[in-house]
Amino acid sequence: MIKQYLQVTKPGIIFGNLISVIGGFLLAAQGRIDYPLFLATLVGVSLVVASGCVFNNVIDRDIDKKMERTKNRVLVKGLISLKVTLVYASLLGIAGFALLYIAANPLAMWLAVMGFVVYVGVYSLYMKRHSVYGTLIGSLSGAAPPVIGYCAVSNQFDAGALILLLIFSLWQMPHSYAIAIFRFKDYQAANIPVLPVVKGISVAKNHITLYIVAFAVATLMLSLGGYAGYKYLIVAAAVSVWWLGMALSGYKNAIDDRVWARKLFVFSIVAITSLSVMMSVDSMAPAHEVLLTYLR
């Protein structure tokens, strides 16, 4: 039973989000780590993400039973009652929001609320089923965790937070479109209007390429804005160029789209993990803050 309650929270998604939270937190901390705050932020975000995933599982029950990848999920098979699941999801969310508010700051909590509402209320309940722009809207919720981590330390939504929001939102797009391509039949069977299904794989490839270019520009802004050092810059540039090269290889006539998309998806995880690690270890104070410190 415990295993089923864990599965419904989608542990893989929680873990992936924690990596980005750590990146945002340590970027803002600049080596001065408040460990109780760090732990509270990680636990708080984990609880909120878990809550969102459980609610998503409840909402997507009808869709999940039509998809090969999700047809054996806990709620599809009726292994946990709907009433208990809703209570479970609510308690997780309340605990997460409360922890962020008390142990971090109100801004971190409200950013978590924003991400939660977008994911559950806007994306899962409506956009995913009715609009090709669902992925775009959903990307905002996916970009919330690193911004929460950053703002838990800084207690302000500054240029650094905005750049993080851009980086992780833009990353979500090619990442999600790649999934939709190699899981094309699943999305088609469930009648989910993702771009590859609605507009075709060729159009999706064009969007993937453009979003990776935009992502590359956004990643460099952290260094150009003085938030991360040259080591991060080198890794960000290398990762972006490699990812773009992989995207461009998808235009070859002999390419197997499903194989190509899966490779692109796998590398997207490598890319965002690499950036999260590098912004953690190569953070620095923005130039204007260094100047103010010097003048004092």
From Swiss-Prot:
Sequence similarity: Belongs to the UbiA prenyltransferase family. Protoheme IX farnesyltransferase subfamily.
Biological process, per Gene Ontology: heme O biosynthetic process
InterPro entries: Protohaem_IX_farnesylTrfase, UbiA_prenyltransferase, UbiA_prenylTrfase_CS, UbiA_sf
UniProt cross-references to Pfam families, sorted A to Z: UbiA
Superkingdom, taxonomy of origin: Bacteria
Transmembrane segments: 11-31, 35-55, 84-104, 107-127, 132-152, 162-182, 208-228, 229-249, 264-284
Keyword entries, A-Z: Cell inner membrane, Cell membrane, Heme biosynthesis, Membrane, Transferase, Transmembrane, Transmembrane helix
Topology of this chain in the membrane: Multi-pass membrane protein
Protein's name according to its UniProt entry: Protoheme IX farnesyltransferase
Misc. comment: Carbon 2 of the heme B porphyrin ring is defined according to the Fischer nomenclature.
Signal sequence range: none
Catalysed reactions listed for this entry: heme b + (2E,6E)-farnesyl diphosphate + H2O = Fe(II)-heme o + diphosphate
Protein role: Converts heme B (protoheme IX) to heme O by substitution of the vinyl group on carbon 2 of heme B porphyrin ring with a hydroxyethyl farnesyl side group.
Subcellular location as annotated: Cell inner membrane
Pathway connected to this protein: Porphyrin-containing compound metabolism; heme O biosynthesis; heme O from protoheme: step 1/1
Entries under PANTHER family matching the protein: PROTOHEME IX FARNESYLTRANSFERASE, MITOCHONDRIAL (PTHR43448:SF2)
E.C. designation(s): 2.5.1.141
Any one of the GO CC terms: plasma membrane
One Gene Ontology molecular-function label: protoheme IX farnesyltransferase activity
